[in-house]
Amino acid sequence: MRHNQMCCETPPTVTVYVKSGSNRSHQPKKPITLKRPICKDNWQAFEKNTHNNNKSKRPKGPCLVIQRQDMTAFFKLFDDDLIQDFLWMDCCCKIADKYLLAMTFVYFKRAKFTISEHTRINFFIALYLANTVEEDEEETKYEIFPWALGKNWRKLFPNFLKLRDQLWDRIDYRAIVSRRCCEEVMAIAPTHYIWQRERSVHHSGAVRNYNRDEVQLPRGPSATPVDCSLCGKKRRYVRLGLSSSSSLSSHTAGVTEKHSQDSYNSLSMDIIGDPSQAYTGSEVVNDHQSNKGKKTNFLKKDKSMEWFTGSEE
């Protein structure tokens, strides 16, 4: 998939204001009385009060100051082959659509993650928390476990949930992210491919499917996406929101009608941050070492990063 971008000037710092619902309480209106100033001093005082009133109308409450390096570090997470393949498997964007990914970024900011804490495991923890907050379908988010924890995910997922709770505590339990906040985050680099992950209407809403015989969740990296009768095969490959250089998108596309049982090479999972939170012996799985020489850097084709890598004026 090609991702074209128009060159545009973007400031190195963006401030996103978040309105608080508590500020919208209804208060009785005071009667307005107009008094004509009787002297010059009174007129100057009147102008000063008017200026102060205009200042008070500016947005109040918490805000996010987004630096260029913050967005760059977040986008670099999607260089990870495993995360790319996870997005490819989520072909219907039910686990990681653009709004859930924007919430993940906001969690990173609220938690004040350093650049070194922009890691794979923290990405999956934040994404799981976003699904917990927003999604009615509980079982779908469990697909994150085998991708984040590897083949031993059944033993490791209790610790994963503890890390989720620690992240929730670190953001002061402010897990709600408004739609406007998400859209302002996406507007910083609107043509980046992760913001093209639009979920279809038929996958939205609080509609449960009680027929659990069709798909057993979670399925993990060793399986291919399930055919979706609602999205259709064409939609599944056109709107993945994934770089065309992903090895899975090119290798597995030809065998999508069968479930691949190829073994994946286990890798040690990097957890950068608090060493006390690191897993011991946990594994993640992928099948990319055989294609290592064939992979290309998708950022060379994705021009949406140009304003991040360019020199600041």
Swiss-Prot record:
Map out region (Disordered) in residue numbers. 278-313
Q: Name one Pfam family in it.
A: Spy1
Q: Which InterPro entries does this one have?
A: Speedy, Speedy-Ringo_regulator
Q: Which residues carry this modification: Phosphothreonine?
A: 224
Expression by tissue, per the entry, reads: Highly expressed in testis. Expressed at a low level in wide range of tissues including bone marrow, brain, heart, kidney, colon, liver, placenta, spleen, skeletal muscle, salivary gland, thyroid gland, thymus, trachea and uterus. Expressed at a slightly higher level in adrenal gland, cerebellum, small intestine, lung, prostate and trachea. Expression is cell cycle-dependent, being restricted to cells in G1/S phase.
Where are its TM segments located?
A: none
Q: What protein name is recorded for this chain?
A: Speedy protein A
Gene name tied to this protein: SPDYA
